[in-house]
């Protein structure tokens, strides 16, 4: 009897509800597994969680490296967009995070980039750089600009003209007076437009405006390539041949008596003021020479380019439309820049 009553009591345990008492926790099940854990830190691979954010200089350097070396078009464009935003949002009187001498050598090769968005974003960034810092770097900038002007792709040639236009706005005097800035750039214009003189017949030719094996249809597929080229050429010739308004104003000796030509004896305001003398550099040819004076630029232009340009302008006027209007602007620049050239002192 005792054993059977005990067995019945044990069976009833499985079906009895446990009464909870105040102040006592519920009993844990027999198959309970403790899943709680304690951790003092969380480690995430390839990430660094710090209390202080990187400085503007560090961020600028990082994105500058991405813009200049990344193989992804999207990444280069986004990096340039970040750099543009950072420059445009900083105070006017605050210096840029990195010197222009460090920025330009890294970004100038992007003038020849195959992606149109990258080139467009590059031009927006270049326009935010301090104009005073561009003059001493014009020579290196023109190397890539001239390469873009004679590129096989039409879009790159058009964007290279926009870069040259920006250079003329911020440092026009340096563009036309730096080594190779006058003759080599004019040769690039002549090759790009197709105004060339045949060496065999010594006759001006623009048969199909062919350059590097490209037909006129491909060269001007946008319909506005030639007018754009003529307008930028007008700006370039105006910077090199036309006297500034301040210099063209007549002055009387009474205004400056007893001091004459004071500005010629002042301390030069530009770096390497005697670079045109080429005292210690390698010998230069006519194309790589520096033409500081307006008279020298007039002489070289008259000797090598004026006849072809005048003939090309006359042909462009016959096309009427935008090309004709651009040719009229170029004609006015030629008249203002060369009307006082006599060629008497041309001994070369």
Curated annotation (Swiss-Prot):
The keyword Nucleus applies. Residues 1-11 have a biased composition (Basic residues). Its main location: nucleus. Keywords: Nucleus, Ribosome biogenesis, rRNA processing. It is found in: Nucleus. One of its GO terms (cellular component) is rixosome complex. Pfam families: Ipi1_N. Residues 1-22 are annotated as: Disordered. Disulfide bonds: none annotated. InterPro entries: ARM-type_fold, Ipi1_N. GO terms for biological process: rRNA processing. SUPFAM superfamilies: ARM repeat. Component of the RIX1 complex required for processing of ITS2 sequences from 35S pre-rRNA. Component of the RIX1 complex, composed of ipi1, rix1/ipi2 and ipi3 in a 1:2:2 stoichiometry. The complex interacts (via rix1) with mdn1 (via its hexameric AAA ATPase ring) and the pre-60S ribosome particles. Belongs to the IPI1/TEX10 family. This is Pre-rRNA-processing protein ipi1.
